[in-house]
């Protein structure tokens, strides 16, 4: 596994992003504000090709600050649950997504269906892939749940840590081939940094797998090693998936991370080779 070369250092695909630059906020609808980043930028570095991905899944976004004007000019608010297929050509850059959603604020739409259809059309075009959008109206806010990730939390392991550089080699020799298990583990200690701005990205991650039992201390050290790693949320989750398959020989694997929101958006990448995402419920920190 290659983990020394930085695939992003001179990537022209990142040069035009509004992320990390001063920007004006537009209050009237403008689909051109959306910016995509090719998934291949990260996948090439971890030896993945679009034709032979070892997982399926989605980037599950929650938009908490969706607002527009109805036909009479009265402001409306809602939450949007957005799922972007793992097969899309691009991921969507989050600051551009925020700016795009802000452009709805002073724009009239005839009804909520028109808002939903506009979101699907524009996001699908930017991502070059399938997108679904569910709009949650205020009358349903009361049934929105706060949950914990399934499984056993590994964060209480009493370990000493002095190295915070990303290192997948923590997973080397981390399994016991004599113990074949099916278990679900989670951690709230995932932290990485924005690829462009280096701002901290705080997350929780669930790992559900079948295969040789993974040493939990080594797994926790591996997850902590993301602490100073600069990469987008979606890319971190795919990297975790690939590393676990490579080092731990999981026969079945799901990696699901939920990151805290920024700019009214949270991103929750889900990758699995045997199951599909269920209902999206936020965690306490989201």
UniProtKB/Swiss-Prot annotation:
Gene Ontology BP annotations: queuosine biosynthetic process; tRNA modification
Enzyme class: oxidoreductase
Enzyme Commission number, as recorded: 1.7.1.13
Single GO molecular function: preQ1 synthase activity
Keyword RNA-binding carried by entry: no
GO CC field: cytoplasm
Alphabetical list of InterPro entries matching this protein: GTP-CH-I_C/QueF (IPR043133), NADPH_dep_7-cyano-7-deazaG_red (IPR050084), QueF (IPR029500), QueF_N (IPR029139), QueF_type2 (IPR016428)
Active-site residues, Swiss-Prot/TrEMBL: 194, 201
Cell compartment(s), UniProt: Cytoplasm
Reactions listed under catalytic activity: 7-aminomethyl-7-carbaguanine + 2 NADP(+) = 7-cyano-7-deazaguanine + 2 NADPH + 3 H(+)
NCBIfam families linked to this entry: QueF
Protein task: Catalyzes the NADPH-dependent reduction of 7-cyano-7-deazaguanine (preQ0) to 7-aminomethyl-7-deazaguanine (preQ1).
Official protein name in the record: NADPH-dependent 7-cyano-7-deazaguanine reductase
Lineage, opening ranks: Bacteria, Pseudomonadati, Pseudomonadota, Gammaproteobacteria, Alteromonadales
């Amino acid at each position: 596994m290659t983990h020394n070369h930085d695939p992003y250092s001179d990537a022209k695909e990142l040069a035009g992003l509004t992320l990390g630059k001063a920007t004006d906020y537009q209050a009237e609808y403008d689909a051109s504000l959306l910016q995509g980043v090719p998934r291949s930028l990260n996948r090439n570095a971890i030896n993945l090709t679009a034709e032979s991905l070892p997982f399926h899944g989605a980037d599950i976004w929650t938009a908490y600050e969706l607002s527009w004007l109805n036909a009479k000019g009265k402001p409306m608010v809602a939450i949007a649950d957005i799922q972007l297929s793992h097969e899309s050509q691009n991921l969507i850059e989050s600051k551009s997504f925020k700016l795009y959603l802000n452009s709805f604020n002073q724009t009239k739409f005839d009804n909520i269906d028109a808002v939903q259809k506009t979101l699907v059309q524009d996001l699908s075009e930017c991502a070059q892939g399938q997108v679904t959008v569910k709009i949650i109206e205020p009358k349903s806010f009361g049934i929105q749940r706060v949950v914990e990730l399934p499984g056993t939390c590994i964060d209480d392991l009493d370990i000493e840590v002095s190295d915070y550089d990303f290192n997948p080699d923590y997973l080397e020799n981390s399994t016991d081939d004599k113990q074949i298990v099916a278990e679900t583990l989670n951690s709230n200690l995932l932290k990485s940094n924005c690829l462009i701005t280096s701002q901290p990205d705080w997350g929780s991650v669930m790992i559900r797998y079948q295969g040789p039992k993974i040493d939990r201390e080594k797994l926790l050290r591996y997850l902590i090693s993301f602490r100073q790693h600069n990469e987008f949320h979606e890319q971190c989750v795919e990297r975790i998936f690939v590393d676990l398959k490579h080092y731990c020989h999981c026969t079945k694997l799901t990696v699901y991370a939920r990151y805290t929101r920024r700019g009214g958006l949270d991103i929750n990448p889900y990758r699995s080779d045997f199951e599909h995402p269920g209902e999206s419920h936020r965690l306490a920190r989201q």
